[in-house]
Structure formats: structure tokens, C-alpha cells
Amino acid sequence: MRIWVLENKTAAEAAEKIMLLKTRLKSFNFNFGDIAPILLTDNGGEFSNATAFENDESGNLETHLFYCEPNSPYEKPDIEKNHTLFRDIVPKGSSFDDFSQEKVDLIFSHVNAVKRKQFNGKSAYDVFTFYYSEILANVLGISFIPPENVIQSPRLLKTIK
């Protein structure tokens, strides 16, 4: 899972971030639609420009964006598991005001490093890099965290400057 920090939480800002990602992926010969043929999101205003997410810069459809119903975690259980793991590190009620992209990347690198029953004892990072590559994980800002170094508690935040 990859999360981007949005300063203003607007559709324009989200569209800009997704276009920057698509451009960056292309510069490494990766196609966004091959990596993410389906996008699941909530109904937040920052996701209201579906065309920016679904189409490439030429207007060609490359992925499909689906909006999940409010209060329906069963529609995106894997995302909800990541949310639970995130909350192990950043408890509900915590402020995100000082969260830089680097801080979020480190938090989700730890989330992605947790071994999971659903992956037969592998981590999301292990599964992702098996199918795609460590290069792509690095392009996305996802770092490998050795199992013995995973910190799945608020203590991780104290290690981040």
C-alpha cells in the first residue's frame, strides 16, 4: 500500500499527485494500469476527478476507479487491514500536521513488512516484490524493513525526526 500526503486534500492536488506518479512510473518503464488495474477509494472529495485517476495523459483508459460505500469495510478488507496496522503505529486522535511524505513512507514500509496469515506468512512487501520487483517498490517509496526491525507501535514515531 502506498499513501501520498495531500496538503490541501483537493481533487486538483490528488490529480496532480497521480499524474506525477504515472510519469515517474513511465520513466522506469512501468505502466500504471498494469500495476493498479483497479483502484478502490472512499467518497472523499479528493477522489472526485475520476478521469485523472482512470486515464493516462492522452485520455486513454488505463485503470478503473471504484468508490466504496461508507461504513462498508467488507468492500475493501485488505485496505482495512492496512488501516488497522497503521493505527497500531498512529493511534486514532493523533495529529497528522507534522507528517511529511518521508514519515508516511516509513510508516507504510513498516505496515507493508508485517507478516500476514492471508499471505501464508509473507509480508505485503514480499508479495508485491515477487510479482513486480524491488525496483518498483523503491520507485513507489516503499522500503524493505527486515522482519526483526519492524516496529508496529507508536514507538516507531519516536525514531522519525
Where are these regions (language model features)?
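Short small-residue beta-strand/loop micro-motif enriched in glycine and branched aliphatics
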Residues: 1-4, 67, 92
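Active-site beta-loop-alpha junctions of metal-dependent nucleic acid enzymes
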Residues: 3-30
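Extracytoplasmic/secreted cell-surface and envelope-processing proteins
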Residues: 13, 47-50
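Short helix-terminating capping/connector loops at secondary-structure junctions
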Residues: 30-35, 60
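Hydrophobic "anchor" residues on beta-strands that sit immediately upstream
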Residues: 38
